[in-house]
UniProtKB/Swiss-Prot annotation:
Catalyzes the transfer of sulfate from 3'-phosphoadenylyl sulfate (PAPS) to position 3 of terminal glucuronic acid of both protein- and lipid-linked oligosaccharides. Participates in biosynthesis of HNK-1 carbohydrate structure 3-O-sulfo-beta-D-GlcA-(1->3)-beta-D-Gal-(1->4)-D-GlcNAc-R, a sulfated glucuronyl-lactosaminyl residue carried by many neural recognition molecules, which is involved in cell interactions during ontogenetic development and in synaptic plasticity in the adult. May be indirectly involved in synapse plasticity of the hippocampus, via its role in HNK-1 biosynthesis. Signal peptide: none annotated. The gene is Chst10. This is Carbohydrate sulfotransferase 10. Glycans are attached at N99, N228, N316.
Length: 356
């Protein structure tokens, strides 16, 4: 009996020592600095296959721009700009919106970002949101022209002549350095109003005489999404809405190429959850935001934003209602489902007057 007790005690001792050793091993190999949560920028299409960063789902580290950095401690900092950045940070953390708020920092994104090395500025292009005027500002800053008035309209979007390099043209190290240290900004507007502007500009008026929108893209959308196949009218906004709200539109997007930049989401264009922007301007308050951005970038003494015609940046609910009139609630809800991330990231009110 005495031997049985000794044997039992020995077994308990072995088990106890094993548990202590396991705990010690766990503590020894635990990552003390939390490197498992270290954030990285993802470059999938610009780097060789072996250099792709796989599986990263974390948020980027806070960069340290060489220009003026937004800070909660600055007494002269208008709270609206801090609130916008805080809203983006909080929305990026919402797991339910991850598929609508996150994207890889791919070549498509890097192609949208224009570089001014002289003044350490990055500008992410968001078409139909005063993008042309901001490109003119950067063209002057880069030294291609001495004033905005001298820039020919046909040069602004000619990237072989306007002197604006894209971020994608730099090495991986050069890209990362600029993303971490430069002043970065982009402009947004109400997502649905932007889609209306894109439709009017590319399929109705087409002031730059870009025939591929009417002759190639429009017919492709009509063939796929028009309900009444006997109707011979050109593309209608209803066709456009069905295309944009279709979860299976990807094959058409691939055919349309980079022309889709005029209507894809801000998330797809600028990756706001992956890149820590210094300022996000709003088209609706551009009269105040443009001078503020120039000041924060440290260039307000060098260039001015072109004069903004009165009322042109105001949100026009009546126009939005008119364009969506007659479009089914199902199609509008599908459209909102795609752009919900943009609405929530940038604080735009859900358009219940269209959805309900």
């Amino acid at each position: 009996m005495h031997h049985q007790w000794l044997l039992l005690a020995a077994c308990f001792w072995v088990i106890f020592m094993f548990m202590v050793a396991s705990k010690f091993i766990t503590l020894t190999f635990k990552d003390p600095d939390g490197y498992s949560a270290k954030q990285e920028f993802v470059f999938l299409t610009t780097m060789p296959e072996a250099e792709k960063l796989r599986g990263e789902k974390h948020f980027p580290e806070v960069p340290k721009p060489t220009g003026k950095m937004l800070s909660d401690s600055r007494p002269d900092q208008p709270p609206v700009y801090l609130e916008r950045l805080e809203l983006i940070r909080n929305t990026c953390k919402e797991e339910a919106l991850r598929n609508l708020s996150h994207t890889e920092v791919s070549k498509f994104v890097l192609d949208r970002i224009f570089v001014c090395d002289k003044h350490k500025i990055l500008f992410c292009q968001t078409p139909k949101v005063g993008n042309t005027q901001w490109k003119k500002v950067l063209i002057v800053l880069n030294g291609a022209f001495s004033s905005i008035e001298e820039i020919p309209e046909n040069v602004v979007h000619d990237h072989e002549k306007n002197g604006l390099p894209r971020l994608s043209s730099f090495s991986k190290i050069g890209i990362q350095k600029r993303l971490k240290t430069y002043f970065k900004f982009f402009i947004v507007r109400d997502p649905f109003e932007r889609l209306i502007s894109a439709f009017k500009d590319k399929f109705v008026h087409n002031p730059r005489f870009e025939p591929w929108y009417r002759h190639e893209i429009a017919p492709g959308i009509i063939r796929k999404y028009r309900k009444n196949r006997t109707e011979t009218r050109g593309i209608q906004f209803e066709d456009f809405v069905r295309y944009l709200g279709d979860p299976n539109r990807r094959w058409l997007d691939l055919q349309f190429g980079d022309h889709i930049i005029h209507w894809v989401t801000y998330v797809e264009l600028c990756a706001p959850c992956e890149i820590k922007y210094s300022v996000v301007g709003h088209h609706e308050t551009l009269e105040a935001d443009a001078p503020y951005i120039l000041k924060e970038a440290g260039i307000d003494h060098l260039v001015s934003y072109p004069t903004i015609p009165p009322g042109i940046t105001m949100y026009n609910r009546t126009k939005v209602e008119q364009y969506f009139l007659g479009i089914s609630k199902r199609d509008i809800r599908r459209l909102y489902a795609r752009f919900e991330g943009d609405f929530k990231l940038f604080g735009y009110q859900k358009p219940d007057f269209l959805l309900n």
